[in-house]
């Protein structure tokens, strides 16, 4: 390195680092202001729901192009179909193992804490009208239906819907076809490579609107449900948050340590995205940014393109913890005795139903209804108990799902020898000078490496 460049190395550090110019700072401010507005003026807060909905719709608008371009260019550049199958297989092994751990953890905590004990609720007295819609949707959840729904009606229909797995399916097939086309497919690959630049610029533009979306979403949540709704069921909510924290810091933390990185540094690296997920209660709102940041952290683009979108359907750690914990809470609150056989049935069905509801609005509640349906002894009407606080637990579900998918991407990348450890260290250590030097090469073209 030239002496002058070393001497001037720290110079660009300050212009990029003022906290008041960072996205996460303004998202925090928006969340605080939204919560205050929703608490002090509930009616006004509820009217701001369109702000949050509009932002999430804008992000969903760009998700399909991001996934398609990332996967197609990644697979086509690999040029080996066997590599794609190997990465997918490793990802599914990881997802199955940690989804099982999450379900078991929720089950164990429910037995240790007994969050519903002593409530002595009579299911007949519960108002079931509000949960009827969720129960009806749960009837449509079948494994065969879920698998068939992955196949789109036409090649273009995934881009006008909201099923991530359909986009993933088409992108993988198109990427493999492009790789098999060889030199004749190069012009198409170059075109798609060039398209990644404006698409990811658009992602950056949309992310600047995140504070507005977070403000509206939080104002609506607090305005409609109120902080008071947390008091009566605080033991359940607290148990869920602590269990999710335990899963992230202990289980995912141990996996991260074994793979050579810190879970706390990863959380710091993704702080802007995590705050966005917290504000919007939707992990999908940060999906494009997560894919971009994982590549910038040293993961190979083809691995990111396969693991992240697939993980959004198959690696829902927060949802899995919620389902077993909530199911046993309802059983305890209604004084329902569950035998080991009943609990095993709940566990097995939860493993399947959590995948079948991917991309469905109100997925957590719908999968819970589907899971409870296999054990008639547990009254589905008991779901009305947690309807008021489900929105507050939704944030924790989304955050845990998001962190779980970030860790999964790094672990599978390392497993596949597709992780640049030096680049990862620079990103997670927050070495601004080195990071800006790396980022100056233009993050979007780096996606096509």
Curated annotation (Swiss-Prot):
One of its GO terms (cellular component) is plasma membrane. One of its GO terms (molecular function) is succinate transmembrane transporter activity. Keywords: Cell inner membrane, Cell membrane, Membrane, Symport, Transmembrane, Transmembrane helix, Transport. The chain crosses the membrane at residues 18-38, 61-81, 93-113, 159-179, 202-222, 244-264, 311-331, 369-389. GO terms for biological process: L-aspartate transmembrane transport. InterPro entries: C4_dicarb_transport, Na-dicarboxylate_symporter, Na-dicarboxylate_symporter_CS, Na:dicarbo_symporter_sf. It comes from the Bacteria. It is found in: Cell inner membrane. It holds the Pfam family SDF. It is a multi-pass membrane protein. Its main location: membrane. PANTHER family: AEROBIC C4-DICARBOXYLATE TRANSPORT PROTEIN, PROTON/GLUTAMATE-ASPARTATE SYMPORTER. Responsible for the transport of dicarboxylates such as succinate, fumarate, and malate from the periplasm across the membrane. Belongs to the dicarboxylate/amino acid:cation symporter (DAACS) (TC 2.A.23) family. This is C4-dicarboxylate transport protein. It comes from Xylella fastidiosa (strain M12).
């Amino acid at each position: 390195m030239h002496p002058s460049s070393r001497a001037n190395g720290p110079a660009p550090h300050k212009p990029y680092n003022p906290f008041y110019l960072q996205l996460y700072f303004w998202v925090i401010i928006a969340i605080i202001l939204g919560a205050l507005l929703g608490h002090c003026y509930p009616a006004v807060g509820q009217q701001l729901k369109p702000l949050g909905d509009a932002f999430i719709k804008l992000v969903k608008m760009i998700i399909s192009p991001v996934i398609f371009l990332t996967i197609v260019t990644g697979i086509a550049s690999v040029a080996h179909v066997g590599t794609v199958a190997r990465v997918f297989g490793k990802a599914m092994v990881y997802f199955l193992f940690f989804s099982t751990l999450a379900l078991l953890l929720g089950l164990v905590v429910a037995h240790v804490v007994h969050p519903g004990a002593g409530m002595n609720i009579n299911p007949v007295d519960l108002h079931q009208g509000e949960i009827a819609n969720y129960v009806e949707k749960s009837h449509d959840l079948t494994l065969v239906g879920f698998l068939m729904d992955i196949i789109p009606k036409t090649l273009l229909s995934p881009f006008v819907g909201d099923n991530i797995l359909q986009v993933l399916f088409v992108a993988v097939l198109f990427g493999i076809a492009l790789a098999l086309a060889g030199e004749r497919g190069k012009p198409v690959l170059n075109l798609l490579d060039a398209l990644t630049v404006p698409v990811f610029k658009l992602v950056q533009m949309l992310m600047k609107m995140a504070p507005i979306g977070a403000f509206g979403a939080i104002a609506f949540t607090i305005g409609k449900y109120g902080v008071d709704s947390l008091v009566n069921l605080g033991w359940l909510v607290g148990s869920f948050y602590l269990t999710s924290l335990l899963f992230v810091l202990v289980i995912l933390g141990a996996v991260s340590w074994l793979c050579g990185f810190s879970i706390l540094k990863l959380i710091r690296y993704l702080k802007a995205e995590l705050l966005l997920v917290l504000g919007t209660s939707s992990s999908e709102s940060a999906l494009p940014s997560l894919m971009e940041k994982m590549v910038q952290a040293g993961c190979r683009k083809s691995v990111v393109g396969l693991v992240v979108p697939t993980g959004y359907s198959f690696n829902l750690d927060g949802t899995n913890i919620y389902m077993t914990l909530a199911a046993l809470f309802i059983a305890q609150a209604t004084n329902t005795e569950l035998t080991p056989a009943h609990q095993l049935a709940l566990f097995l069905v939860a493993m399947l139903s959590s995948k079948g509801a991917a991309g469905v609005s109100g997925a957590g509640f719908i999968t819970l209804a589907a899971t409870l349906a296999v054990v008639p002894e547990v009254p589905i009407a008991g779901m009305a108990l947690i309807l008021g606080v489900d929105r507050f637990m939704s944030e924790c579900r989304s955050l845990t799902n998001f962190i779980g998918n970030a860790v999964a991407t790094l672990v599978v990348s390392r497993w596949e020898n597709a992780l640049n450890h030096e680049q990862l260290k620079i990103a997670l250590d927050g070495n601004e000078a080195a990071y800006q030097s790396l980022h100056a090469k233009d993050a979007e073209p780096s996606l096509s490496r």
